[in-house]
């Protein structure tokens, strides 16, 4: 069958859809936000494809995979196994990096293990293999009379029971072994947990160093090397043991390293991970700036968290410490600001006096007392308290004053020094993964390997080159493999998974993607489209939910869903090529494609007001000492290719520095020399795409504050007054009015052993969240549950005569959210929808005209018609005297800006510079600006 046939799709707002989608083609599903695109692509096609695949597996396998609900659809024919690549960011696990997520790091570990050259971490000398004579000579250098054990490590950090190993070595005549550090008799019944990792070392011999033991020692070392894969451990009684390898050792200092294995290069394995930070690269430590936020205060008032309670004036224990230390070093502290105290003295206060003892003097009701002891230091004391506390609350409290600080042992490299001393060419594995992806590929291609190394590495190099190229093809050449996966944007993480899927080479699969072009500059769009076509050409069906016009024109077929959002959507308006859609009179998308409808370029752009916010000398991440002005009272767009430093400049430097100053916060901020012009604004609001709440209880009504007003209305009804119901009766968060069977959730979770957990409507309240008595109170014939079930559009009409409520809900409708329900769980809202709920909440507030609004890619998830509405709203905010600053790639929005700040020229280390600033027309004339080159077509210059 060469097509997927869907009959009677009714999931969410889909109106009994019947549609045929060609297989093994690139198909774009487009339409307004909330029109039903995701309902068709993800909740119908993907859900059913995944469900059928999982149902075919055993019940044992199903419990790990989880099964999806059967979508509301009569039938789907011709379905393939489905893989979804959505906007959800990759793992927040600090151990996940771009390298591990893409599996490129696995190939690099293999490369370093097979053709890496080890160097001594102490001397920097190339390490060669050790002969038996060299090993014996080194052992014989021990002092006469030293007791030693010779051991052969046969199992190192591997899971299993190993009963056969114990039996074999006992048969060979060995008597004892050391298992996980404990000496055991091989004749004993040794029980090991097969799920845990173990180390087993066979005890070969026990010796005392004398002149005449050389022959016996040589024989024992030979035996150990034979049974333990060229390794031998010499355990010196009363001292440290030493590992020798017949493979590699430093001729100068005697440092030896075992045979290189891929596990040694993994920071997730004890064999390679830095023991100090366990391979994470950083440690959570007390931050001096957070503990001493106010350097203008005195020592008594300025240090938080120290002493018997939170530090405050008159805290006698802390005062005694400080005064005694000050007396010891001859420093005056009374009435002196912290910033004026000697730094050497503050070092002693913060980090301790080491072995130096202080005469502590303190007074009590029984007289004056002396105690001589070193001072531990504020930071070591608080870190010890943090380690020792058993209270989750206290731990959380201490962590408010802690930050992630680079590990002092590995300096963020995550690996042991001996592993970092292994090089391929001139670089170790950390230095290589710190390079941008494009540079890594160039470096690997330029390597000069010997004939033998070439034979060993050729296949590994092919795989590496192929996978690196896939990442370059999807516009991610600026990323480094060492970048933490949790710091990637939704678009970046989706494109990484897309590149990984191409690398897997699967065929006959249905891929469903959610706006892969998000966060991608127009310059890189063609590479992404080529990648999607490559995935299709492998023999897969590629279905993309997308608003990008270039992708539509590149697709084999476009499906336009609409005509409106929510209840007004769910129909197929047009289906065919982009050229055919452009001719359709039913399709809003077609009207924009053909130019019959468009977002107009402003006839006149706002003039500069003479008021600016200025960042001076920003150097965070890849920013190259950037100094830039942002004109206030304007609509500003910050543009540039992916990875050029836009988010770093705006979110890390500008927003965090302003927020810290205006709110006296202890927030860690992006590095810059200074920030000027703050007196021109009274507040800064960052309207991002994070969820409006983390639990199903949070919803648009609670977030916007309209739910409080609605509960006030219900509390003033005659029925509520007669029953004595207060406002709290109409809350589903507290006992009283809520249904106690489901605690006001409206749903009950049922745990299934071999299936995913099932959520069913509460049988008592039928999903309405409230008890029967509360639901009897009606306003205009509707209960509180009925109101929460209304769409925004319905609620605007319902509360037409209550301006306070109507105005708040009206702003939700204005930002294109007329289709969402007032009580819709926040967990079901997309990032773009959550951002617009926040935007609507801000719009409904009284404007001061001195606010800076920051939005990071507000067009995410928006159809061009929704972008049209968004532009109108943002312009309204600026008309009231405010400043709107957006980070954006969408040229339809960029062309309406008053002022553009363009970063570049490239991404990553080649970015971080200001390429051009000014009105859009000026940017188009800048030859180095990629944004300007593409903007010309939109401004018809």
Where are these regions (language model features)?
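Conserved phosphate-binding elements of NTP-dependent enzyme cores
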Residues: 1-941
């Amino acid at each position: 069958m060469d097509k997927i046939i869907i009959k009677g799709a009714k999931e969410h707002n889909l109106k009994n859809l019947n549609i045929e989608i060609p297989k093994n083609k690139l198909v774009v599903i487009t339409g307004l936000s909330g029109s039903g695109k995701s309902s068709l692509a993800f909740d119908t096609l993907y859900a059913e494809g995944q469900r059928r695949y999982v149902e075919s597996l055993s019940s044992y396998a199903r419990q790990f995979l989880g099964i999806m609900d059967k979508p509301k659809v009569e039938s789907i024919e011709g379905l393939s196994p489905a893989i979804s690549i959505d906007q959800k960011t990759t793992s927040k696990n600090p151990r996940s990096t771009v390298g591990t997520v893409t599996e490129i790091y696995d190939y690099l570990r293999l490369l370093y293990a097979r053709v890496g050259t080890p160097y001594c971490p102490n001397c920097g000398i190339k390490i060669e293999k050790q002969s038996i004579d060299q090993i014996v000579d080194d052992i014989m250098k021990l002092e006469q009379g030293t007791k030693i054990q010779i051991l052969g490590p046969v199992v190192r950090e591997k899971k299993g029971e190993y009963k056969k190993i114990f039996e074999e070595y006992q048969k060979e005549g060995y008597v004892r072994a050391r298992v996980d550090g404990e000496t055991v008799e091989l004749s004993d019944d040794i029980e090991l947990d097969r799920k845990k990792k173990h180390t087993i070392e066979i005890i070969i011999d026990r010796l005392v160093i004398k002149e005449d033991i050389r022959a016996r020692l040589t024989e024992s070392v030979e035996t150990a090397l034979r049974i333990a894969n060229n390794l031998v451990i010499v355990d010196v009684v009363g001292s440290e043991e030493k590992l020798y390898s017949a493979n590699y050792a430093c001729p100068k200092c005697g440092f030896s390293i075992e045979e290189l294995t891929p596990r040694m290069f993994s920071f997730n394995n004890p064999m390679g991970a830095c023991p100090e930070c366990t391979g994470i690269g950083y440690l959570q430590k007390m931050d001096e700036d957070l503990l001493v936020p106010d350097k203008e205060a005195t020592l008594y008032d300025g240090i938080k968290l120290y002493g018997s309670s939170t530090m405050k004036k008159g805290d006698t224990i802390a005062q005694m410490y400080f005064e005694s230390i000050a007396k010891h070093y001859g420093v005056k502290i009374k009435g002196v600001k912290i910033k004026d105290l000697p730094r050497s003295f503050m070092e002693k206060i913060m980090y301790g006096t080491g072995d130096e003892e202080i005469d502590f003097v303190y007074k009590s009701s029984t007289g004056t007392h002396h105690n001589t002891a070193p001072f531990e230091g504020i930071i070591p004391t608080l870190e010890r308290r943090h380690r020792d506390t058993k209270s989750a609350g206290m731990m959380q409290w201490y962590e408010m004053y802690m930050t992630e600080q680079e590990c002092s042992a590995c300096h963020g490299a995550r690996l042991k020094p001996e592993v970092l001393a292994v090089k391929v060419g001139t670089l170790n594995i950390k230095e290589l993964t710190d390079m941008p992806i494009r540079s890594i590929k160039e470096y690997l291609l330029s390597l000069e390997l010997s004939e033998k190394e070439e034979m060993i590495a050729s296949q590994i190099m092919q795989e590496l080159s192929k996978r690196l190229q896939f990442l370059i093809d999807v516009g991610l050449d600026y990323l480094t493999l060492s970048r933490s996966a949790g710091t990637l944007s939704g678009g970046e993480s989706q494109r990484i998974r897309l590149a990984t899927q191409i690398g897997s080479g699967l065929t006959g699969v249905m891929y469903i993607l959610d706006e892969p072009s998000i966060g991608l500059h127009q310059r890189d769009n063609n590479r992404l489209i080529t990648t999607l076509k490559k995935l299709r050409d492998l023999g897969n069906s590629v279905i993309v939910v997308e608003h990008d016009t270039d992708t539509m024109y590149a697709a084999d077929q476009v499906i336009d869903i609409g005509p409106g959002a929510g209840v007004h959507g769910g129909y197929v308006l047009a289906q065919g090529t982009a050229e055919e859609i452009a001719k359709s009179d039913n399709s809003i998308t077609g009207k924009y494609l053909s130019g019959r409808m468009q977002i107009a370029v402003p006839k006149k752009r706002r003039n500069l007001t003479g008021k600016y916010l200025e960042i001076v000398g920003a150097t965070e991440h890849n920013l190259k000492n950037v100094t830039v002005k942002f004109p206030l009272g304007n609509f500003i767009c910050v543009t540039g290719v992916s990875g050029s430093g836009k988010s770093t400049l705006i979110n890390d430097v500008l927003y965090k520095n302003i927020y810290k100053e205006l709110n006296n916060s202890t927030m860690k901020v992006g590095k810059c020399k200074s920030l000027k012009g703050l007196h021109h604004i009274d507040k800064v609001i960052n309207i991002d795409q994070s969820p409006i709440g983390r639990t199903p209880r949070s919803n648009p009504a609670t977030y916007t504050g309209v739910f409080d007003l609605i509960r006030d209305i219900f509390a003033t009804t005659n029925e509520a007054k007669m029953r004595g119901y207060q406002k709290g009766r109409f809350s589903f968060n507290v006992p009283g009015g809520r249904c106690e069977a489901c605690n006001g959730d409206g749903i009950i979770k049922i745990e299934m052993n071999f299936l995913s957990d099932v959520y069913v409507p509460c049988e008592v309240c039928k999903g309405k969240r409230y008890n029967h008595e509360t639901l009897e109170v009606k306003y205009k014939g509707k209960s509180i549950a009925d109101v929460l079930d209304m769409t925004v559009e319905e609620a605007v009409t319902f509360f037409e005569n209550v301006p306070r409520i109507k105005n708040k809900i009206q702003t939700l409708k204005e930002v294109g959210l007329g289709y969402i329900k007032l009580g819709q769980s926040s967990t079901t809202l997309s990032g773009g929808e959550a951002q617009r709920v926040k935007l609507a909440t801000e719009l409904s507030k009284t404007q001061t005209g001195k606010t800076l609004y920051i939005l990071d890619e507000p067009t995410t998830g928006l159809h061009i018609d929704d972008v049209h509405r968004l532009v109108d709203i943002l312009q309204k905010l600026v008309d009231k005297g405010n400043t709107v600053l957006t980070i954006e790639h969408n040229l339809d929005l960029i062309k309406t800006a008053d002022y553009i700040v363009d970063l570049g020229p490239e991404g990553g280390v080649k970015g971080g510079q200001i390429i051009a600033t000014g009105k859009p027309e000026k940017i188009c004339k800048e030859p180095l600006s990629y944004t300007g080159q593409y903007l010309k077509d939109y401004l018809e210059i």
